[in-house]
UniProtKB/Swiss-Prot annotation:
GO terms for cellular component: cytoplasm. This is Ribosomal RNA large subunit methyltransferase M. Signal peptide: none annotated. The active site is at K300. It comes from the Bacteria. Keywords: Cytoplasm, Methyltransferase, rRNA processing, S-adenosyl-L-methionine, Transferase. GO terms for biological process: methylation; rRNA processing. PANTHER family: RIBOSOMAL RNA LARGE SUBUNIT METHYLTRANSFERASE M, RIBOSOMAL RNA METHYLTRANSFERASE FTSJ DOMAIN-CONTAINING PROTEIN.
């Protein structure tokens, strides 16, 4: 099981290869990354038998930027009939697993396999259980089968607490009909990814204050209002009347890059389409000057060298806070609802909750 298989957004296979190669070098795991364009997946082939396992053990999945999901394992060719017997025979060398996910890659060809997976899962689950290879235990490894076609599957393992929280890393979020734009799902997914669910009541509470830079028409403001927060929406464009009618939103027609609140707030969010370095500077200013405690900001990506640019900006942000003597946690992820962008989450670790006026 010397292959690490990773899902990603189509078109970002090269970024996954660059990123995982960086981490492999850091962990002294020998191997090479490979991918074909627009296949929504990439592989890292380890030269040592335990390389993929060491790579996964040495790297937290939630700290990766571009991979949506990962698993270590091997590819298996399948016959037209009796696929289950072939899979069971190969799984003899695998440990007992605590859960089972059947996955496909995020391409048109992959989506066409979804119905096959739905029909195949029940008999496979039954056979695995009867063979003693599958039990209901979240502490045991997760068995991930990624079907490239009806005749080829990647048999993979991943720890349930060190892999994606959704199959293929694709969240099942429902677009709220009352939200003014689909961008609302980006902020909701960001909260799921960066904030443990059992901390939402504390860190996304209704007694908090927030600022949404570049807010109009209010897709991200909607998420803040839904949590009961007071929101200052900064944008020269119009806000959705439904949000203004809540009484929780103050709309200021101002420049999001120059506005600063009179009093510190709990949250700042920003989805302004601008050069990534300029949006990154907002994070340094707002967190560094104590204007907010937590922030979610999207960084639009260049056409080339996208991983290198993101890495450069994150390093600059981290160095800036170190120079200020400010303690922060920094997270970055290309979310499912992101396109040519990544989402950054920063949290100050040394300031108290803002007082609501």
């Amino acid at each position: 099981m010397n292959t690490l298989f990773m899902h990603c957004r189509p078109g970002f296979e090269g970024e996954v290869c660059s990123e995982i190669a960086d981490h492999a070098a850091r962990l002294d795991v020998a191997g090479y990354a490979k991918a074909r364009p627009d296949t929504a997946c990439a592989e890292f082939i380890c030269t040592e038998a335990d390389g993929a396992e060491r790579l996964m053990n040495g790297q937290r999945f939630d700290k990766l930027i571009f991979p949506r999901q990962w698993a270590r394992g091997l590819f298996l060719e399948l016959p037209e009939t009796d696929r289950i017997s072939v899979i069971l025979a190969q799984l003899a060398a695998f440990p007992i697993c605590g859960s089972l996910w059947l996955e496909v890659v995020d391409t048109n060809d992959g989506k066409e396999l979804s119905n096959f997976c739905k029909k195949f899962e029940a008999p496979l689950r039954k056979a695995l259980t009867q063979a003693g290879k599958l039990v209901d235990d979240p502490r045991k490894p997760r068995l991930l089968l990624t079907f490239k076609s009806g005749r080829e599957v990647f048999l993979g393992l991943a720890d349930a607490d060190n892999s994606a929280m959704w199959p293929m890393g694709i969240p099942r979020l429902k677009f709220p009909r009352e939200a003014p734009s689909r961008s609302t799902l980006k902020l909701e997914e960001a909260w799921h990814h960066f904030i443990p669910r059992d901390q939402w009541d504390e860190r996304l509470s209704g007694d908090m204050t927030s600022v949404d830079l570049g807010a109009a028409p209010g897709g991200w403001t909607y998420q803040l209002v839904r949590r009961g927060m007071l929101v200052t929406a900064i944008d020269n464009g119009p806000m959705a009347e439904s949000l203004m009618d809540t009484g929780l939103v103050q709309h200021l027609m101002a420049d999001g890059f120059t506005y600063k609140p009179r009093q510190p707030v709990d949250w700042m969010v920003c989805d302004i389409v601008e050069k990534p370095a300029r949006n990154a500077a907002l994070l340094e200013t707002w967190l560094g000057e104590g204007l907010c405690r937590e922030a979610v900001v999207n960084l639009k990506l260049p056409m080339k060298q996208r991983y290198a640019e993101v890495r450069r900006l994150l390093d600059r942000i981290e160095e800036g806070f170190q120079a200020r003597g400010v303690r922060v946690s920094i997270g970055c992820k290309q979310l499912y609802h992101d396109r040519e962008e990544v989402t950054c989450h920063l949290r100050r670790l040394d300031v108290a909750k803002a007082a609501r006026k």
